[in-house]
Regions:
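N-terminal membrane-anchoring/stem segments of glycan-assembly enzymes
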Residues: 1-50
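Long helical/loop segments within the catalytic core of UDP-sugar-dependent glycosyltransferases
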Residues: 23, 110-113, 121-123, 127-129, ...
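Cell-envelope/extracellular polymer assembly enzymes that use nucleotide-activated donors
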Residues: 52-55, 83, 235
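Acidic helix N-cap motif at the loop->helix transition within catalytic regions
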Residues: 68-69, 93-102, 148
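Short, acidic, metal-binding catalytic loop of nucleotide-sugar glycosyltransferases
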Residues: 72-81
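Short beta-strand/loop segment that forms part of the nucleotide-sugar
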Residues: 81-90, 110-114
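Catalytic donor-sugar/metal-binding loop of nucleotide-sugar-dependent glycosyltransferases
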Residues: 237-255
Length: 311
């Protein structure tokens, strides 16, 4: 063991830089395999719809190019009882006019107009306040729902009374560029693997804000989304789990999304994600010392070490 004490700081530094990703990769693989064998393997058949209704919330800000497709796919949901609420978050383009037009076409569609842009968190809360049902399915204004996505998410929300939120499995549509194809591999394998392993080991770092289902009772207990946080999806995930609600990852609940295909766009997106994660860690570090929240410790420790490794 003497050699261990003879190492220089640079040796420890480079050892950590190279060995930490390798260690986490094996940890994720082991957790992902366990999740598949324990849960995913037995969930092949599309579940039967429950007797509960749901509200699909779609916050929209300057989505004139995509909102028609988004609403169209939402309306093709293979679930018997649902409503769609589109929230126009003070758009400056033709989003408002398009939504009003679509409301005349689809009887299930309701439109809420906000006078000015308030942000996604505020728009979601506005939609939740006017929704008629206990279960909320939230997607982005440019996301496309798979016809069975709501079935899978409602299956978990209604079957498990302690589940406060379920996160779906986003798939990337735009694959024309090399950057887009790389992100396809990232979302199809790495991100899904991490969520599977986190669910296996205890808690999930964050739901996918682009495709997520909530129990309104759970949201009401924690005060819904905070509009002062950079990434409201990470924040609401942590607060739900602080309130002892479970979060489920549902790989069969598919949604199709558009991702940045330029390095600048990708950099801005990932920078926002990183800032949001750090913001949540700083905001809730003191609460993490509570023994009742010990199941959140692995997620918090992993996040802290990952931030340290990144720097």
């Amino acid at each position: 063991m003497q050699w261990l004490f003879n190492l220089r700081f640079s040796d420890y530094y480079f050892g950590f830089a190279f060995l930490y990703p390798l260690f986490m990769a094996w940890l994720w693989i082991a957790g992902g395999i366990w999740f598949y064998l324990k849960r995913e393997y037995r969930e092949n058949d599309v579940p039967q719809p429950s007797e509960h209704a749901c509200s699909i919330l779609i916050p929209c800000f300057n989505e004139e190019d995509q909102v028609r497709e988004t609403i169209k796919y939402a309306m093709q949901t293979q679930y018997p009882d649902f409503e769609v609420i589109a929230i126009n978050d003070g758009s400056s383009d033709k989003t408002a006019e398009i939504l009003d037009e679509l409301q005349q076409t689809y009887s299930r569609l309701r439109v809420v107009h906000l006078a000015e842009n308030q942000g996604k968190a505020y728009a979601l809360k506005a939609g939740a306040m006017v929704s008629q049902h206990e279960y909320l399915i939230c997607i982005d204004g440019d996301a496309l729902l798979h016809p069975h996505a709501v079935l899978w998410m409602m299956h978990h929300l209604t079957r498990f009374p302690r589940v406060g939120a379920v996160t779906g499995n986003p798939r990337i549509i735009n694959r024309s560029s090399i950057l887009g194809k790389i992100q396809v591999g990232e979302f199809s394998s790495i991100i899904g693997l991490i969520k599977r392993s986190q669910r296996t080991y205890g808690r999930i770092f964050t739901v996918s804000g682009v495709l997520v289902g909530f129990r309104k009772t759970a949201l009401d207990r924690i005060g819904y989304w905070r509009d002062d946080m950079i990434t409201e999806d990470i924040d609401v995930s942590w607060r739900l789990q602080f309130d002892h609600w479970d979060l489920h990852y549902v790989p069969n609940a598919l949604g199709y999304i558009y991702m940045p295909e330029t390095f600048i766009g990708l950099w801005k997106q990932r920078l926002r994600w990183a800032q949001g994660g750090i913001e949540v860690l700083l905001a809730y570090t003191k609460q993490m010392f509570n023994w009742r929240l010990r199941r959140m410790w692995p997620v918090a420790i992993e996040s802290m070490i990952s931030i340290l490794w990144a720097y």
